[in-house]
Amino acid sequence: MEYNQFEMELRSALTTGNGTKLLYKIIDAPYRFFSPLQPFNYKVKLEQAFLRTQENTYVKFIKYCAEYLITQYGFKLEKSSFKYTLPLKEGEEFPEEVKVNAAMIFRQKENGGDEETADICVIYLKKRDYYGAKEVTKLHDNIIKQLEVLRMIYPNNKIKGILWFLDNDYHKNVNFFNECYDKEHSFETPGFRAYYGAQFFKIFDKEEDWLLVENHIKKFKNSNYDYFLKMPDLDQDEDVLNAMINLNETSWQKLISPDEVYANIRQYIFNERNENSNLFKALKLRDIKRTSVDDDEEKRRILELENKANQNE
């Protein structure tokens, strides 16, 4: 992946749908933004939520780069997040349900090998290895439990577990992971290896490909762009308006609820003195959508509303 493609796709990821994501967060968990139990005002909390979302989007994009490369090598990614119900054990009233939540799963077959018996590579992704003793033990045990489930699902395949840390500068628990793997390997129980940074791509003999991505990441960081730090205006953002028009009825009723917390939301994020506020536009457009007999009538009424708004400007 060349840098121009990297930056273009990252720019798109960091600027698409930001207002919509923020709107959903506010509706689903208003107490995070309006609560007497936290000292910050709503603007600070909105900014925190927005920047946290941007950071998560950034990491997801880095994961996407890895997926892109792996598929370019000819591997097919399989479903990596799902729930699996274990067989009911004696004495249990209900069977245990395990959530498999890997970053990637793909088959790794030898040259000329059979797809059905190919090794199943299961990748767990973390930003950096900074965990304390209790945390790392919990992380290890959770991954092992998921790998045991995957061995049930793929009884004819070897399960290869991998914990990949993106940041190559922190190796706090490398000895712990190596010791656990050696012990598990000797008893032929499911285990996983820890890899750091470009080391993971040695599996494909393509370490230089990830080193190139790491260089792209550093170049983007050193450019000090700030366009993705500006929080969208929920009162005027076009994507937010479209999201409001298409909100399910439960979420919409929350947003227009007379409850104090939602009244505060409307007061702070919408300009209730402006008839062109997204709030009032959404009210009108949702009504048109609800009462129109067909798509043609809906389009006609929306056009009439837009023409009327233009005449009043």
Q: Which residue stretches match the model-derived regions?
A:
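Short secondary-structure capping micro-motifs at structural edges
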Residues: 51-55, 88-92, 108-111, 146-151
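A short acidic/basic microdomain associated with nuclease active sites
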Residues: 71-97
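Active-site beta-strand-loop-beta-strand hairpin of nuclease catalytic cores
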Residues: 96-122
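Domain-level recognition of nuclease-like catalytic cores that cleave nucleotide substrates
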Residues: 157-313
